[in-house]
Amino acid sequence: MSVYDVVIVGSGASGGAVAYTLCKAGYKVAVLEKGRLINREEFSKDELAYSRRDLVTPNLFDEYHTIEEKIEGEWVTTPTYESGWSFWNGNIVGGSSNLMSGMLHRLHPDDFRLKSKYGEIKGANVVDWPISYDDMEPYYALTEELVGISGKVDKHPFEPPRSTADFTQPPTKENAVVKLFDKSCKALDITPLVTPRAVLSRNKPGRDACYYSNLCGSYGCSSGAKGSSREALLKPALSTGNLTLLSNTYVKYLHSDNKDEVNHAVVVDTVTGKEKEIKGKIFVVAAQAHESARLLLNSASEHHPDGLGNSSGEVGKNLIFSGGGSGQGELHKETLKHIKFKELMTTGLFVNRSILDWYFIDHWWDGTFKGGSVEFMFEHQNIISRARKNGYEEGKLVWGKDLGERLVSRFTEQKSIRFEVFNDWLPNDDCFVSLDPTHKDKFGMPVGKLRLEGHPQDVKVGNYIAKKCEEVLEEMGAKNIYSSVSSSPPQNLVAGGCRFGNDPKTSVLNKYCRSHDVKNLFVADASFMPTGGSVAYTWTIYANAFRVADHIVKQLQKS
């Protein structure tokens, strides 16, 4: 049986970054991915496949989670095959990085020291990170170049410092609506920023620039422009000859022969059903935060009775999501100002605008507290989801001629512009993942049970920013403006569960994301994050995984 230098569980952003670095350094790497390989040319823009079918995620009757929510003061557990609330995100080679919208920001230096900046927050388990922004910055820059992030550096008081003057990839093409948006923001004394995006505006070797298909977020990319782990990292890693990519490989648990070392992974071929062992010198878990914690808990043994690497009892604890919410307004043909309606209706081009003005809030009336960021975009262009929004009016079903007229109007006489608010989801004692005592997946392993409870501050911040965004849409002349902020978590933005820190009693990982308990075990996905910042996690996930990979190279060189 082959013994790999490094075995990586998961092929998403973090798994790809570690694999790329190790393969380029000459080490033999195995990547274990539960899902199948979908090649670039197979990514279609099929609305049915992506909105109504299980194309890139497991069927919920085969693999699922159970969700604990507080209802009328009582914790109620529901399996997701009943609720339809899926916490799977892109179970294919490259993971959910294949399907992201790619709107990325770096964390701010103060995100690494939230407790020092704001002190204790009642009901929240906020801690400072064991590293600083300066430790991460070189890897943000590396991600920008290797993954391919397009953008433009705009001067802003909350823009993190950079080691490079600007992006090497200029911004992607923009819809004319940005003229109206920028003008409206300036009228309100708000600074509009060009959104950094993991989408190529120019060709890179082996990858073509964006062709503006109009179907980007939630869809795979058929040009290679999107900065997925599969395109940007795994394909170059495969070309080294050092990577063994094992798709359709479900990892049941990690086996340890002694207390401080993992020996092998026990896996199942999801096509044949055959079980086997994969041996390695170092193991890297990168299966997405809640699933990484579940894997460690399912890897309990006589040496690790409470779960692998869980002497602290912290595995699965302090799960975090992204706080905030969303909203939108409609730009109508008859009331549109400053731009032509034909320009607005041009398909494929991005809105490409962010606002960071409320990232840190220090106001004489509203007070001082951590805020968040905002991304602006057109509503999702999947025609099915857009059409379904018109099926009801005042709670009554619309059908026949009335429905047809509503659809024609929606698709030809207006365009909806959306915003998404990202703010910290404060870690707390009632947001965690554990093993469900009764439910098991089709492979016989206990499923993850997610208790989902937010902190009141999350909703307060989300509402504060959403109201500001509504003012922007109002200034743009939008109609039917609304926003929705709640403590319900977005299932595509999950972090925490194996937080890193200097104290083995209160954290799972050290500052290099190596287990405090197990010397050859690393966790490289978003699990490490003790706090999430107020932006989407992906750029930070990539950057930290490159940082961790560099440390693994040094560890292998020493041995």
PLM region spans:
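FAD cofactor-binding and catalytic pocket of flavoenzymes
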Residues: 73-96, 100, 106-107, 111, ...
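A glycine-rich dinucleotide-binding beta-alpha-beta segment and adjacent secondary-structure elements
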Residues: 194-198, 209-217, 252-255, 410-432, ...
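Short, hydrophobic/aromatic-rich segments at coil-to-beta transitions
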Residues: 260-266, 416
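Glycine-rich loop(s) and the adjacent beta-strand/alpha-helix scaffold that form part
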Residues: 24, 28, 35-49, 240, ...
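N-terminal glycine-rich phosphate/pyrophosphate-binding loop and immediately adjacent elements
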Residues: 2-121, 125-142, 291, 305-331, ...
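Conserved redox-cofactor binding core of oxidoreductases
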Residues: 55, 62-70, 75-85, 98, ...
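Alpha-helix N-cap/helix-initiation motif
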Residues: 11, 125, 226, 273-276, ...
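Residue-level detector of alpha-helix initiation sites
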Residues: 8, 12-13, 172, 290, ...
